[in-house]
Amino acid sequence: MELTGNIKVMMDTKEVSASFRKRELVLTTEGKYPQQILVEFTQDKIGLLDGYRVGDQVRVQIDIRGREWQSPRGEVKYFVSIHGWKIEN
């Protein structure tokens, strides 16, 4: 899948654990009803963001990932994340 828009926010790299890093950006989509979409780049894909800045018009190739989580009380919740794997002007 692909998202097109302007970079609204570019966050710093986060060290989530000793073996996992991620960097997030917020992309403002185009169209009649623009959306603010949070896209994660992880591990070796973080370097793809080097050279891009807030305000840049970009196309981002994404995967949508979902997961299930169960609380200690047995409640089940579902989470969705958007992972970027390619970015270009």
Go through each PLM region and give its residues:
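Single-stranded nucleic acid-binding surfaces, predominantly the OB-fold ssDNA-binding core
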Residues: 1-89
